[in-house]
């Protein structure tokens, strides 16, 4: 599988952009600030339904525009399909396949699988739990067809439940006629949905970690040395899911115990939104004891493990994205990731300096030239629009004169 053409409209810093890719290694080279990371991020969003750089759609849309569009011609097994997503600054994101009917973007998540390696990957080990939850969500979205929809539903339910807790906390928005009892009745309904969806997300995440654990341990040992033992440990907020065959009743009782604290704080105190994933090295938490080099290697092994699992589960090689990673890695790790990349169907690499371009055959894209071409196209479009407007104005004046 590979992307042959990518087109962006109003995506971050790109007003309009069209570029062609080749199978194998593609290198986007240009100085910082030209928008090369935005290009590969657009592929990530098309693939996983989200970006590792932001949890909101708003930053993905060029300022002053209501939406951004990403289109990709994708070739796989001799067939070509066109995938299009429309990212709304406000509201639901939509998608089309081959110009067909509009559907939710979540419905095509994972159809063009990709795995990204970025300078922020070390934060998968050293960063906060939200970084690791984002990784879990992207991984599960690639591996489990229903996951993206379940996550979106859970996020909506969690917001509704939190809003009711806040009302109970500060008394705001409580109807004077029906009062507190109506809010409590609503809270009971939303809590039931919160538990049901949360249990499913927890099971899905546990399944995904189960798939990743063996290849992660094996790949880390091959990168760092056989004597090193790395492991993944899931730490779900709903730990009842792993302890009981029927966890919903136990979780409901848990909510009853913490109800005063939730009302006092006005927020959901337990649930998948508080999950974590611990990476352990030699039976110790890596974020506390591993060196920077070991953290980089663990993050690299985790992404390679995800690639291996997605490839096996989907029977297709995901597109590999290497976003500005060569400047961050030492010579040994750079060689390891290059060896991995050269075996894939398509790799998109961003580099700032020509000296960072890896040796070997590659399709190199000059991002500065691409930016100049994009601006020239924008100017032509603006000039054409002005001419059309002037023509309409002259035509209107002529009609008025005749009358």
From Swiss-Prot:
Described function: The RecF protein is involved in DNA metabolism; it is required for DNA replication and normal SOS inducibility. RecF binds preferentially to single-stranded, linear DNA. It also seems to bind ATP.
The keyword Transport is annotated on this UniProt entry: no
Localisation: Cytoplasm
GO MF entries: ATP binding; single-stranded DNA binding
Source organism: Bifidobacterium adolescentis (strain ATCC 15703 / DSM 20083 / NCTC 11814 / E194a)
This protein's encoding gene: recF
Binding site residues for ATP: 30-37
Protein name in UniProt: DNA replication and repair protein RecF
Domain of life: Bacteria
Gene3D superfamilies per record: P-loop containing nucleotide triphosphate hydrolases, RecF/RecN/SMC, N-terminal domain
Family, similarity comment: Belongs to the RecF family.
Entries under HAMAP family matching the protein: RecF
Pfam (any one): SMC_N
PANTHER family, per database record: DNA REPLICATION AND REPAIR PROTEIN RECF
PROSITE patterns assigned to the protein according to its UniProt record, in alphabetical order: RECF_1
Chief location of this protein within or outside the cell: cytoplasm
UniProt record, GO biological process: DNA replication; DNA synthesis involved in DNA repair; double-strand break repair; SOS response
UniProtKB keywords: ATP-binding, Cytoplasm, DNA damage, DNA repair, DNA replication, DNA-binding, Nucleotide-binding, SOS response
